[in-house]
Amino acid sequence: MEQIIIQIISATIGSIGFALVFNVKRDKFRYVITGAFLGITTYFIVDYLTHSTFLSNVIASIVCTASAEFLARWRKAPATLFLIIHIIPLVPGGSLFYCMRSFVLKDQEAFKSYGLSTLYSAAGIAVGILVVTSFLSILYSYKRPEQR
């Protein structure tokens, strides 16, 4: 449990670094970091309950995308500003590194294992983003009766 808390804090600090690199303005800074914290915390909770990399990434990216879309409308800023920083902690950088390392060292078994882990993570993130953006697109495509 202690290791998970350290990973959550580290991921949040890493998101702060990316927020600084992307020049996120002060009035949006705390919202961007809070979303990243929520996303990685959701990931670890779902991973603890299900032990599924794919499902953990799907649900965490749904939380990240929904919060990014909400914040974009509330703070009147592009959703990608929030979404990129929210998703950063979910990106499977470690497994991608070890996948490529195994490939270079010609360790086929490790390459396959890390490669599948990377693909599951990336696909989970993509599916989560797709679900929320598609839902919101359909939702906002219908005009309210009084606006017709």
Positions of the model-derived regions?
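Non-catalytic interaction surface on structured domains
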Residues: 44, 69, 74-82, 95, ...
